[in-house]
Amino acid sequence: MTIRILCDFDGTVTEHDNIIALMTEFAPPEAFEPLKKGVLDQSLSIQSGVGQMFRLLPSDRKQDYIDFLEQRAVIRPGFKTLLAFAKSNGIDFAIVSGGIDFFVQPILQELLTDEAIYCNGSDFSGETIRIEWPHTCDAACNNQCGCCKTSIARKLKQDGDIIVTIGDSVTDFELAKQADHVYARDYLITLCEQHGIAYTPFETFYDIVDHLQTTEVYA
């Protein structure tokens, strides 16, 4: 049996959502805001919404985007402690993110290998950014997730494994419905309460480490 922690990135590992920050800074608000609303109220699939958002951004400003996000990204307190706790206790840890490789990987490069990061890809060869989807939905999911967290969980899970998810928003909801234990903050708490999904609230990763150390969450 392996305990597998599948952790969101934007708004979870980082204190703010990097896609929202990037779009707010660089995208035309009259085009971005309806897409944001559609994704959040689930009238627009994540894959469609995120794909359309990035088509609003010119490819030739790639370094500006990277510099902007690296300068403002704040890692939520306790993340290194959680990684160390997972390593010392034989817990498998992976990032499952609806974010994009060109900013997720640089922000995490000193903390995790790329092999432990599941996220969307990017193509800057055209006039605007085209998002690539290496982790699309499997046959068991038809939600057009983009980076399908439930499909990744099914791919990784072996018989007897325990899936723990950590997240903050609508992109974490489908996995929260299937995980053995959920750590939630912000909008994911609202969704869990609306649908009767058990969860443990957190604000920092120290909260999660404390809970893992003191509670039999895997029973």
Curated annotation (Swiss-Prot):
Hydrolase as a keyword of this entry, yes or no, is yes
Keyword Amino-acid biosynthesis in annotation: yes
Q: What SUPFAM superfamilies does the database record attribute to this sequence? A: HAD-like (SSF56784)
Function, as annotated: Dephosphorylates 2-hydroxy-3-keto-5-methylthiopentenyl-1-phosphate (HK-MTPenyl-1-P) yielding 1,2-dihydroxy-3-keto-5-methylthiopentene (DHK-MTPene).
Record EC number:
3.1.3.87
Q: Do you know which NCBIfam families this protein is assigned to?
A: DKMTPPase-SF, HAD-SF-IB, PRK09552.1
Instruction: Provide the protein name.
Output: 2-hydroxy-3-keto-5-methylthiopentenyl-1-phosphate phosphatase
What GO biological process terms does the UniProt entry carry, in alphabetical order?
L-methionine salvage from methylthioadenosine; L-serine biosynthetic process
Q: Which reaction does it catalyse?
A: 2-hydroxy-5-methylsulfanyl-3-oxopent-1-enyl phosphate + H2O = 1,2-dihydroxy-5-(methylsulfanyl)pent-1-en-3-one + phosphate
Q: Which family does it belong to?
A: Belongs to the HAD-like hydrolase superfamily. MtnX family.
Which organism's genome codes for this protein? Exiguobacterium sibiricum (strain DSM 17290 / CCUG 55495 / CIP 109462 / JCM 13490 / 255-15)
From the UniProt record, report the name of the gene that encodes this protein.
mtnX
UniProt entry keywords in alphabetical sequence: Amino-acid biosynthesis, Hydrolase, Methionine biosynthesis
Please name the taxonomic classification of the source: Bacteria, Bacillati, Bacillota, Bacilli, Bacillales
> From which domain of life does this come?
Bacteria
